[in-house]
Amino acid sequence: MLKAYEFRIFPTKEQEQFLHKTNGLCRLYWNTALARKQDAWKNNEKWNIGTAKKVFEECKPEAIEWCNEIDSSALAAEWNDITSAFNNFFKSCKGQRKLRVGAPKFKSRKYSQVAITWTSMAKPKILKNGYLFLTRKLGPVKGTFHRWAEGDFKHATIKQTPTGKWFVKVCVDKKPEPKNTNGKSVGIDWNCRDEDFIVMSNGTKVKCPRFLQRSSKQLSHQQKIMSKRFVKGLETQSSNYYRQKQKVALLHEKVANQRKDWLHKLSRQICNEYETVVVEDINLQTMSKMNHGKVVGDQGFGMLRNMIAYKGNLVRVNPKNTSKTCHCCGFTNPKVKVGVNYWECPNCSAKHDRDINAALNILFKYNASQGIVGRERAESTNACGAPSSAVKHEVFISSFESFGSE
């Protein structure tokens, strides 16, 4: 399995200048290849990445004097990215990809962030004095390394965040880590309308802290100040504007780190308790373009799904009629609309909480695909309409509820 390790690094001013030069040349490589492709398409000529590379190699010494100072491994990785971008675009046009991929675009010098990848030709290692050695031209880089990446090295990426911090991501190929094998499975229903973030088939409801909403007033205040300091028509803004822009970026970074930390803890606790986690196969990209776009981004359900996928066993099922179907008898009630949170089955008179019922149906769909067929009527229901047999009062559940109250 491929695993990435991220470390904070502290390059010197000379090393920062080298990284910016490398990023600039990689951007020129990308834009040159894209320009050659567009010219070939207009003239009905055959074109490939190798042809554009040869054309650029001929004019490279005349275009940039310091091009020979750049590491060739970073340029090789850039060509791999160009090839992948065009291949993904062509596959998307032919319908060979699930998600739509747009055509590659030119990279702007003004708005592009520093992100440089080195291929397997580089051999990163940690020196005894706590420095990272990636390439000879870059030299040893000071960093914070709590642990090192174990496995076969694939590639490394150095990037600079909008706040000016530098990080290195080392991707390695290692043996899969042992996962939970206790045989337990749980269904999870995602809720973007109410306070409950996810509802589990065992009756657990997890509230989302909504970190972006908590910081919205402070963020709005800082963004207004930044907007007032922006002068339209100026190519280079004032120092006060860039300082204020840094403050806004720091706030966004804090919110993102809070959300990521909370989701890591939540996903780890779910995977420790259950071997299989079943969720609905929802297109979050479409959901984000609707009325709940800001909530979808603030909750981070897509990030939670990805975390569960590599920490445990994630299964996606068809979300059709999960809220309208009675988990006791299987009757589909067409009267259950979006705003109905509690309803009674007209067929078996069972009372349901909309989200818990949906989570149970999600789990039933997975069980049916595994050959476990049949629905059992619960002996009794609780105040919310959830089957008493499905609500487990464990220490594990109370710790979940504590996530939303922090």
Segments the model singles out, each with a brief description of its role:
Residues 1-77:
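Gly/serine-rich nucleotide phosphate-binding loop at the start of the catalytic core
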Residues 7-9, 139-147, 206-208:
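Generic detection of short hydrophobic beta-strand segments and adjacent strand-loop junctions
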Residues 34-37, 41, 86, 90-97, ...:
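Long, hydrophobic, amphipathic alpha-helical segments used as structural scaffolds
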